[in-house]
Regions:
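Conserved glycine-rich cofactor-binding loop
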Residues: 17, 24-25
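Conserved glycine-rich Rossmann-like NAD(P)H-binding loop of the short-chain dehydrogenase/reductase
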Residues: 38-54
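Rossmann-fold cofactor-recognition segment
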Residues: 61-79
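Active-site Tyr-X3-Lys motif and surrounding loop/helix of classical short-chain dehydrogenase/reductase
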Residues: 83-90, 108-109, 115-122
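Conserved NAD(P)H cofactor-binding loop of Rossmann-fold oxidoreductase domains
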Residues: 101-108
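Catalytic loop of short-chain dehydrogenase/reductase
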Residues: 108-109, 118, 144-195, 202-219
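Ankyrin-repeat alpha-helix packing hotspot
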Residues: 125-126
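C-terminal helical subdomain
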Residues: 220-232
Length: 232
């Protein structure tokens, strides 16, 4: 079944607003496109405003009757998250769903630290936790929260004592960060949330640009693998 035939079987999103973090590329951009296709409006929360505005311009040329807003959002930066939450509460508290898609997978040759922890963990897990901690207590009404999980969550990994532990490989960092995201989902889904509902999605093997910072031969190998895998 083609993606459009599949989407045609789903309910319309007319008069509904969906917020997507990291909505300028990869899975996030695909989600934005499909929400617009189903008649919804979108708020793209993104770090790169220039790229976000380019995406907005292209999409509105196709979906002229839809509405797209942009909120500056760097999931590795505490102040950026808090500022973005304030904007959501003031301008977009009527949102139907929040898709927490933003995330990174660092190249081991360009490992960076933020607040004395690896950027992958800071962005993928700590940032999501801070977003929800600041947003949920101030929200009213019914809202859906969609966590972006991963097939690697829960894989056997190196034991750590703190999220600030060092000497972790890029893949170990990613496993820890995505295991943390899924732990957040299980935590919130067990609470009495007064109209809030929580969902966990795992995209499986998907062709995205999450490894865009890796050496060219790794990016090439990844594309070849996915092409072979999806040919069956």
């Amino acid at each position: 079944m083609s993606i459009k035939k599949y989407l045609n079987n789903l309910q319309q999103l007319s008069n509904k607003k969906v917020i997507v973090t990291g909505g300028t590329s990869g899975i996030g951009l695909s989600i934005v496109k499909e929400v617009l296709f189903k008649g919804g409006d979108v708020v793209i929360m993104a770090r790169n405003l220039s790229k976000a505005n380019e995406v907005k311009e292209k999409l509105l040329a196709k979906y002229m009757n839809r509405h797209i807003d942009i909120v500056e959002y760097d999931q590795s930066d505490n102040q950026s998250i808090i500022k973005a939450v304030d904007i959501v509460l003031k301008e977009h508290q009527d949102f139907y769903a929040l898709v927490m898609n933003a995330g990174i997978f660092q190249n081991k040759h360009k490992l960076c630290l933020k607040d004395d922890m690896y950027l992958t963990i800071k962005t993928n897990y700590v940032g999501v936790n801070l977003l929800l901690t600041n947003l949920l207590p101030k929200l009213k009404g019914e809202h859906r929260f969609i966590f972006q999980g991963s097939l690697v969550a829960g894989w056997h990994n190196k034991s750590i004592k703190s999220l600030k532990d060092k000497n972790l490989s890029a893949f170990q960092q990613y496993i820890i960060s995505k295991s943390g995201v899924e732990a957040l989902f299980y935590h919130y889904s067990t609470l009495n949330n007064n109209g809030f509902s929580f969902y966990l999605v795992e995209p499986g093997l998907t062709s995205t640009d999450i490894i865009r910072d890796f050496p060219s031969f790794i990016r090439w190998a990844g594309k070849v693998f996915l092409k072979v895998f999806f040919s069956f």
